[in-house]
Curated annotation (Swiss-Prot):
Null mutant phenotype: Increases the sensitivity to sodium dodecyl sulfate (SDS, a cell membrane degrader), hydrogen peroxide (H(2)O(2), an oxidative stressor), calcofluor white (CFW, a chitin synthesis inhibitor) and micafungin (MF, a beta-glucan synthesis inhibitor). Leads to sparser aerial and reduces the cell wall thickness by 40%. Does not affect the chitin and glucan amounts, nor the cell wall synthesis-related gene expression levels. Also, does not affect the hydrophobicity of the aerial mycelia.
GO CC term, one of those recorded: fungal-type cell wall
SS bond partners: C58-C115, C65-C109, C66-C99, C116-C129
Record-given protein name: Class I hydrophobin 16
Annotated organism of origin: Pleurotus ostreatus (strain PC15)
Glycosylation sites: N74
Subunit and interaction comment: Self-assembles to form functional amyloid fibrils called rodlets. Self-assembly into fibrillar rodlets occurs spontaneously at hydrophobic:hydrophilic interfaces and the rodlets further associate laterally to form amphipathic monolayers.
């Protein structure tokens, strides 16, 4: 009998606590009460930490997202090499045009993800690129 009464009392208390409406800080201030402290949703330190890029096996630098991936015979490559004064030796791989690095774990590439051996020209042209699939 006592056990049943205790269970009924706990159930009633839980129902009443759940039925109490949430009070906003504006309502508290209107009644002369101090505001409630802000709810902590995440640590500022955790949110500010950079997210690592996924493992991709690119040992020459960050994974790049390139608008175009072309071979040496492409006319645009010839023009860019001439304008930038690039002296090419033997090149293994393709050329990436209009590239930018993929940074962060949630980065997405709408074109072609590549690893390039020479990323010195601010993404205008990247040399020695190989397409990769990193599952983005």
């Amino acid at each position: 009998m006592k056990f049943t009464s205790v269970i009924a009392l706990v159930a009633t208390a839980a129902t009443l606590v759940g039925a109490v409406p949430f009070e906003t800080n504006a309502e508290r201030l209107a009644r002369g009460l101090p505001p409630l402290p802000p709810a902590r949703r995440a640590s500022g330190v955790e949110a500010a930490k950079p997210k690592p890029s996924p493992s991709h096996g690119c040992s020459t630098g960050p994974v790049q997202c390139c608008n175009d991936l072309v071979d040496r015979s492409n006319h645009t490559v010839g023009i860019l090499i001439g304008l930038l004064g690039i002296v090419l030796g033997p090149v293994t791989g393709l050329f990436g045009l209009g590239c930018s690095p993929l940074l962060g774990g949630g980065a997405k590439c709408q074109s072609q993800t590549v690893c390039c051996s020479d990323n010195k020209f601010s993404g205008i042209i990247n040399i020695g690129c190989s397409p990769i699939n990193i599952g983005l």
